[in-house]
Amino acid sequence: MQNTPLKQRPLRRHLASLLVAGAAVALFPVAAWAQSTSAGEAPKVRLSTSMGDIVLELYPDKSPKTVENFLQYVRDKHYDGTVFHRVINNFMIQGGGFTADFQQKATRPSIPLEASNGLKNDRGTIAMARTQNPNSATAQFFINVVDNAALNAPNPDGYGYAVFGKVTAGMDVVDKIKLVPVGNQGMHQNVPKTPLTILKATLEK
């Protein structure tokens, strides 16, 4: 990631923040985003958060392994009680890995990267966070709050970040989350000063 030519240094710093926090700290215009999957077939997941509900439509035709992985974590209630632990306005909000007291949750084995699927890291899309190893995504995800072309395959490190769905309701909630005050907590940066909790993640269809 570090050798990718980017126009703005702040964005380069933000790219580093998409590393999945782990043992060593590991990462749209909604209505206009065209997809090949019909709305009737796409699974939907509701994230009930402490700031309101966010509904995600997922695309198993484009990112089959990523979607099944995410849905299994939902079925296992992995996300219930986790927080958005990294929030950067004009970039993304990231969650799915920690409880409010920053206890890291156990995960299943990592999945292969599916970033070259034609889906873009546009505003309102959801993608998997990972380490510098492209095939290291487990449970952590992020929602893009702006169009982040620098994250699309093969950028920023020759691989890109795998988009697997988009927000179809609750983008106003995402926009509230992106504006919360943040600070440092231990080795973690851009941590909301008040925990933003995913109370429950449920499969709607």
Tell me what each language-model feature is:
Residues 2-10, 17, 22, 27-205:
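Cyclophilin-like peptidyl-prolyl cis-trans isomerases
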